[in-house]
């Protein structure tokens, strides 16, 4: 991945425009989950240490272009950064130029309010580019979208580079997918095979084993000839599951936890995979399966984790995901995890410091795993050549 890196540049006195991912949940004007801001702070500090004149922007929520509403504002992010000790201010009217003082951070208001942002209007890209000497793309979570603040600005800025977060993300994904230490094990959970089909196809060419979980596993259980009762599964994708299972080592659970209804209070019953009744639904893998899969993970040298193996939000159906999570945490393998539910499981079981790399991007993470080109990375590669 040959891109210019912000860490390698002399930024003294330069106007630096950082596209970060500060799309955080906000309630009553306060940030309710600060993970993305915390992840961006080292980039801001580095830019200040290098003597840059720092501008940073992001999208927040899904505003209507050209119609600014107070709830679309990045003001809560500015308040958070102020409380963290930064000299920071919000600039709403910035497209025709911004004055940035030494040592201050200017947060440029929500880019998605600007007309032409989403469809990557070149005129808007040029306006962003005119604000800076160096454009820094540091929002991996939006790298799969070609928009004016992720792609257009990179086309027209004097220099376009990858920020520390984006560079680390690309390095970690490259390490897991391009030349993984073997055995390489992928864990793919989620409700539907259809939404992860390209991920499964791509990983089947890379991974030594694929562990499937959630509704995806139910389709593979059905493909192996077992009754799945009322479980969520995709009957039309059984041929696809059979083909994947024939060409890749995909262990099917030997036992499962079932319930009669999808609720937190449902009674969990553990049983062999071939004993599921017509009125039962599979909500988790059983202990034997979890231990077998934990053993596979223990012997792995690379683990890519995307999705839980059961309905871990319900305590009765949490054990499978808990055992798998701790197996990954205790493994010596290089581990990379991504996706919203996966991050929630990591938080729940308190294992964040034991995962080698936690990806910040949901859709971008999956598209990279699928082998797709991420537009915002592609333009950085092009600009690095010229």
Swiss-Prot record:
Q: Which GO terms describe its cellular component?
A: cytosol
**Catalytic activity line of the entry:** (2R)-3-phosphoglycerate + ATP = (2R)-3-phospho-glyceroyl phosphate + ADP
One GO BP on record is: glycolytic process
Which Pfam families does the record cross-reference, listed alphabetically?
PGK
Superkingdom: Bacteria
Where is the major localization of this protein?
A: cytoplasm
Enzyme class name: transferase
Keyword check for Nucleotide-binding, yes or no.
yes
PANTHER family on file: PHOSPHOGLYCERATE KINASE, PHOSPHOGLYCERATE KINASE 1, CHLOROPLASTIC-RELATED
Query: How would you summarize the oligomeric state and partners of this protein?
Result: Monomer.
What's the protein name? Phosphoglycerate kinase
Q: Which organism is it from?
A: Haemophilus influenzae (strain PittGG)
Corresponding gene? pgk
